[in-house]
């Protein structure tokens, strides 16, 4: 409608070398819509009579109803995101058709819960509300000056014109949605957040047009991450600031792509508290030259226990900030029987990440049954301030 070039559906794997690109026939090319619903405990038994349009034989048609990972009556709210449909249709032109199918599904599932006799614990619950508009995950994606891809997300490529960021996994859903037999989604998590460049928010085809939200210039795979609401809103903030600068200086949106001008946009965003990965301060900001003084100080030397012991049913870690030497840690460990406790010092391979993917030091402690007092001294120091992980991992003898 605007006259700008756009795409709809998945790219071939060979176009960008994206290994996560789906098989278009088997997996599908589009993510579907979902409608959420709200249930309420009334405190007394409530009957439910399903409307005529409610889906019948839901257990046969929706295999995941037999999978407790996806379906159990203790789950509420967004846990039913997988009631999804429309990935095999046109998610723009067929949206009304998709909505009515989702209504059939929701009322059919609720009828199954209330009237199959398998869920007596739901006797007092009523279906309080069903959404009127489906949540949309994917439709058109416009072509900008840059196309963000899987590699930009996973490898966390640096962008000179970064104005936003994302942190959701690459989250793709099979086009068959709720009627599918496999997993309801496939996710690939980056080791940290990634930058979104301004070039993804501007199209070369229309001089005075910004693109934002789910329709920015990204591949189908990358859209699996950038499509979520907080990421879309963060990009919208960048667009709003860019529009203000363009109006003030009588510029076109594309003029701000210039490496000199983009710095002004980034600085303006930073001054409002807008976070940009890798960018600490904008032009003319005071923190780089500021000095902080205090009339007194308190050095924290000990953290007293404030509860019972934390049971290590699985490995666990403590995330702590360090500025040079790693502090020596003393702690009490209780063992049900003689065993070995491995304590690892881990860090992230990239500054700004919070993934313990680098093991810097490992210590082993033989524990006797009962109470053990341990002193953990890694003898390590780091050149720059960062977060590190103290990881407690059991290796049974």
Predicted regions located by residue number:
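Flavin (FAD/FMN)-binding glycine-rich loop and adjacent Rossmann-like elements that form
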Residues: 1-325, 339, 343-360, 365-370, ...
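Structural beta-strand segments of beta-rich domains
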Residues: 327-329
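Extracellular beta-strand ligand-recognition surfaces/modules
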Residues: 331, 373-397
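Short solvent-exposed strand-capping/beta-turn motif centered on an Asx-Ser/Thr pair
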Residues: 334-338
